[in-house]
Swiss-Prot record:
GO terms for molecular function: rRNA binding; structural constituent of ribosome. The keyword S-adenosyl-L-methionine does not apply. Pfam families: Ribosomal_L21p. This is Large ribosomal subunit protein bL21. InterPro entries: bL21-like, bL21-like_sf, Ribosomal_bL21, Ribosomal_bL21_CS.
Amino acid sequence: MYAVIRTGGKQYKVSQGDVLRVETVAGDAGGEVIFDDVLMVGGDEGLKVGEATEGAKVTGTIIRQMRDKKVIVFKKKRRKNYIRTQGHRQNLTVVRISGIS
């Protein structure tokens, strides 16, 4: 059985036992998280999309909170002595999917 969930403005295809890196979800390591925004559920019984997925939930366990690799933002205007460098590290949560219902 698999499902498509939406979290952090992105969509993920998940099945039981998968490990995902998603945008920050509040909680501590070992805590449980519930994804209510299920877009599609598929399996042996067939495919459910849209209103048929109301009431579907995907549960997972938070493995750890982490930060992604640094992305460097570099701006320059030629001949004007203007250079700006800025770094950004996105906060992520590593989640193991424990069930789809």
